[in-house]
Amino acid sequence: MAARKAMVAGNWKMNGSLELVKQMSDAINNVKSNEIDIVLFPPFPLVSAMIASGVSTGTQTVSENTPGAFTGEVDAQLIKELGAQYVLVGHSERRSIYKESNDVVAAKFARAQQVGLTPILCVGESESEQENGKTEQIVAAQIDAVIEKLGVAALKDSVIAYEPVWAIGTGKTASPEQAQSVHKFIRDKIASLNSDLAQGLTILYGGSVNEKNSELLFAQTDIDGGLIGGASLKADSFTAICNSAKGTV
């Protein structure tokens, strides 16, 4: 059985600058630890600078296609050649704003793995879905799209991030107990197909995580770290969150 390792990932979305890359990399290099993986996901123009700074780096999306006539898209192989290690797939903003379906997300997941990138599969329900008791149904469908395309074994070389859409950038956060319940559902679902894989799978929580709530969230049995939005743009906040993840897995 593979041992899980805590991870704190920062999604900069369409924010950041070369100066912020320097500030954040200096801060992160001071808190690096064998206990946790720290990864930043800057916008594409900052990826090379982030990699050069020595911080583990990923991209916020990737094309599901191989190279060709796809203006504005970026191929997974090129991302790999730059030296990035991770890619986000299925973030709720990609699903809602750019209408990426579960099938498209699964195709992006597959393309990332094909070239040796580690996909972080983002899953989560909207506020109305949560209010109507559909959280598990929605999350299961998002995971099943990948399993049906690639088989459960593909999840071995991936990370899952549970981000309830109603908590992203809203200041609302799932309680530690709410988040743990969904994380346990995800792990149990995968364990029903492959127990060892499920126990070794890193599952992150995202949704208005900050230095004040991260410790309680990360203390939950099935929460292995966080996918951080706004707080990943502030060195003090992000490093405090990273420190709170040490020793929790």
Swiss-Prot record:
It catalyses: D-glyceraldehyde 3-phosphate = dihydroxyacetone phosphate. GO terms for molecular function: triose-phosphate isomerase activity. GO terms for biological process: gluconeogenesis; glyceraldehyde-3-phosphate biosynthetic process; glycerol catabolic process; glycolytic process. Keywords: Cytoplasm, Gluconeogenesis, Glycolysis, Isomerase. Its EC number is 5.3.1.1. Its main location: cytoplasm. Substrate binds at residues 11-13, 169, 208, 229-230. The active site is at 91 (electrophile), 163 (proton acceptor). Pathway: Carbohydrate biosynthesis; gluconeogenesis; Carbohydrate degradation; glycolysis; D-glyceraldehyde 3-phosphate from glycerone phosphate: step 1/1. CDD domains: TIM (cd00311). It comes from the Bacteria. It is found in: Cytoplasm. Belongs to the triosephosphate isomerase family. PANTHER family: TRIOSEPHOSPHATE ISOMERASE (PTHR21139:SF42). Involved in the gluconeogenesis. Catalyzes stereospecifically the conversion of dihydroxyacetone phosphate (DHAP) to D-glyceraldehyde-3-phosphate (G3P). This is Triosephosphate isomerase.
